[in-house]
């Protein structure tokens, strides 16, 4: 359903204009020209048309996506695989696929391009590029990446907590360690990785259609 954007290799200005709507890309581009070039080289631009499937429920993969243009719909699937009601709409600038990527679990919802959208354009990153010990990225870039993940998951879980108070969820969040060591260090990176995965565990286990930010939870 999705395809690689053939113009990615020839229209660099268009690529950079689209990515400028994503704070993570802006931060890396501002701080390190070499890392900016590496990130651009390792980012795949994906296109899909109206109704095309972007993520299928039940799939397991290690990719993270940013919607750059268009609109996506998050849907559950019935037992026969047919799409069910729309749970959430994904708008440009939003990230999706986070929780399954962190936990290595199956996607729990299907994401399609909205029928009313002319097209959807997305940026795809491989999580393992940032997570593995021999990452091609610098410590600063990896810190920015995991800070982004922790922020996104905390936001989603906080919205969930406020909309549907859950003492078990509150207790789980209190157990997530807060880093107090040296900033911009390997220790901080390790702590962020731990925080991201520990936040993802209660978030992934408490999905309820209609009241949780489905870009991170049902779609993840």
Please tell me what each predicted stretch does.
Residues 1-220:
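Cytosolic regulatory regions built on CNB/CRP/Popeye-like sensor folds
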């Amino acid at each position: 359903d999705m395809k690689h954007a053939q113009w990615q290799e020839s229209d660099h200005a268009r690529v950079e204009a689209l990515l400028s709507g994503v704070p993570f890309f802006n931060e890396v581009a501002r701080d390190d020209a070499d890392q900016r070039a590496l990130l651009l080289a390792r980012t795949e631009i994906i296109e899909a048309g109206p109704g095309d499937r972007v993520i299928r429920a039940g799939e397991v993969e290690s990719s993270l996506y940013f919607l750059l243009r268009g609109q996506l719909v998050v849907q559950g699937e019935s037992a026969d695989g047919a799409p069910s009601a729309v749970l959430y709409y994904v708008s440009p600038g939003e990230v999706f696929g986070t929780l399954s990527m962190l936990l290595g679990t199956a996607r729990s919802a299907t994401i399609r391009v909205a029928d009313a959208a002319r097209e959807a354009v997305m940026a795809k990153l491989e999580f393992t590029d940032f997570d593995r010990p021999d990452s091609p990225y610098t410590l600063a870039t990896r810190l920015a990446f995991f800070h982004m993940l922790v922020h996104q998951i905390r936001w989603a879980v906080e919205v969930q907590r406020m909309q549907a108070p859950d003492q078990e969820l509150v207790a789980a969040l209190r157990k997530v360690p807060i880093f107090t060591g040296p900033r911009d260090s390997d220790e901080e990176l390790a702590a962020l990785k731990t925080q991201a995965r520990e936040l993802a565990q209660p978030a992934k286990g408490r999905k309820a259609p209609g009241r949780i930010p489905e870009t991170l939870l049902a779609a993840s």
